[in-house]
């Protein structure tokens, strides 16, 4: 180890040596730098390997024309509801039929509105807005599509005919269009063989709330009910499904069944106490004797079965012992015979 002298006191006078302190030298770590890097090793040049593979670069030719892609145009169409389309189709078909038939005269318009009226004072405003002779006018019912359809069917049915039957008509009970009935207070009874569905449709269209409170209409409602046997037969010829549905509706329309609440259990003992023991059914002495006899027979049968099983097991054991004894005797006889020879 190398020792270095370090002055202790620099402020001493001349001709006096300072005290000497011996201490080990400090170990400094070498620092790598550009100057002293050659001291630690030789520098070797970095070699880059050559490219051995070949690369073919494919560049696009200038002759080729670039065609930009066109985006397809999306057409969005709002679909109309089915109900609106059906209503439009029906309106168009009705207009075509009306155009084919031609314009109706005032008399025809009055005749088409005639099945809904009972006297000369009633007219319908939905088909003929101009009032005729009278004071009562029925309002148009265009709120629901069903009522409109029923009205159109009723009008088309009466427009196909040529007249309205009445009891006071001059020729054959038929009046020409445009002429009012002289005494239209009460309609005659229905002719046998004729269906009453247009009158029923008119009543359904008008409803109970829209019918005016007049005695004439009440008489019409009473006369419209079929009373003749022929009319009853025609009404019975309708499909039975409607009657079945009506009967079901009538049954369901009644008040709902109310279940009676079950009464609470009435305990004969208090909550803290236990219930009394169950009582056994009283049997007659004869029944008791019969039951005891059947029990004895069952026990005897079980005992006999056990005895039989024991006997069988014993017999099988005895048979096995006998077979063993016989085999031993045979072996002894064979040995004695072989010894004698």
Swiss-Prot record:
<feature type="region of interest" description="Disordered">
    <location>
        <begin position="216"/>
        <end position="282"/>
    </location>
</feature>
<feature type="compositionally biased region" description="Basic and acidic residues">
    <location>
        <begin position="78"/>
        <end position="89"/>
    </location>
</feature>
<dbReference type="InterPro" id="IPR043220">
    <property type="entry name" value="POM121-like_prot_1"/>
</dbReference>
<dbReference type="Pfam" id="PF15229">
    <property type="entry name" value="POM121"/>
</dbReference>
<feature type="compositionally biased region" description="Basic residues">
    <location>
        <begin position="243"/>
        <end position="252"/>
    </location>
</feature>
<comment type="similarity">
    <text>Belongs to the UPF0607 family.</text>
</comment>
<feature type="region of interest" description="Disordered">
    <location>
        <begin position="78"/>
        <end position="131"/>
    </location>
</feature>
<protein>
    <recommendedName>
        <fullName>Putative UPF0607 protein ENSP00000381514</fullName>
    </recommendedName>
</protein>
<feature type="compositionally biased region" description="Polar residues">
    <location>
        <begin position="108"/>
        <end position="127"/>
    </location>
</feature>
């Amino acid at each position: 180890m190398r020792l270095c002298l370090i002055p202790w006191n620099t402020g001493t006078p001349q001709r006096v040596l300072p005290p000497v302190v011996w201490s080990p030298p400090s170990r400094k770590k070498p620092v790598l730098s550009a100057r002293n890097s050659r001291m630690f090793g030789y520098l070797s040049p970095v070699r880059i390997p050559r490219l051995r593979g070949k690369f073919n670069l494919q560049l696009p030719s200038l002759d080729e024309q670039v065609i930009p892609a066109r985006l397809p145009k999306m057409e969005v169409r709002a679909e109309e509801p089915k109900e609106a389309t059906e209503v439009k189709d029906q309106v168009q078909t009705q207009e075509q039929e009306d155009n084919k038939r031609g314009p109706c005269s005032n008399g025809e318009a009055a005749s088409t509105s005639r099945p809904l009226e009972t006297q000369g004072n009633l007219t319908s405003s939905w088909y003929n807005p101009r009032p005729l002779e009278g004071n009562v006018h029925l309002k148009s019912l265009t709120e629901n599509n069903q009522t409109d359809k029923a009205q159109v069917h009723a009008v088309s049915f009466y427009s196909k005919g040529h007249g309205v039957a009445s009891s006071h008509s001059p020729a054959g009970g038929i009046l020409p269009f445009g002429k009012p009935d002289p005494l239209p207070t009460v309609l005659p009874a229905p002719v046998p063989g004729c269906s009453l569905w247009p009158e029923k449709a008119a009543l359904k269209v008008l409803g109970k709330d829209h019918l005016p409170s007049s005695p004439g209409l009440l008489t019409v409602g009473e006369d419209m009910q079929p009373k003749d046997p022929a009319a009853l037969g025609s009404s019975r010829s309708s499909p039975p499904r409607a009657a079945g549905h009506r009967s079901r509706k009538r049954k369901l329309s009644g008040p709902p069944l109310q279940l009676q609440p079950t009464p609470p259990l009435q305990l004969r003992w208090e909550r803290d106490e236990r219930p009394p023991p169950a009582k056994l059914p009283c049997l007659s002495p004869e029944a008791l004797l019969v039951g005891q006899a059947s029990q004895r027979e069952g026990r005897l049968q079980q005992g006999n079965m056990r005895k039989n099983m024991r006997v069988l097991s014993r017999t099988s054991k005895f048979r096995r012992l006998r077979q063993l004894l016989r085999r031993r005797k045979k072996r002894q006889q064979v040995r004695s015979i072989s010894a004698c020879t």
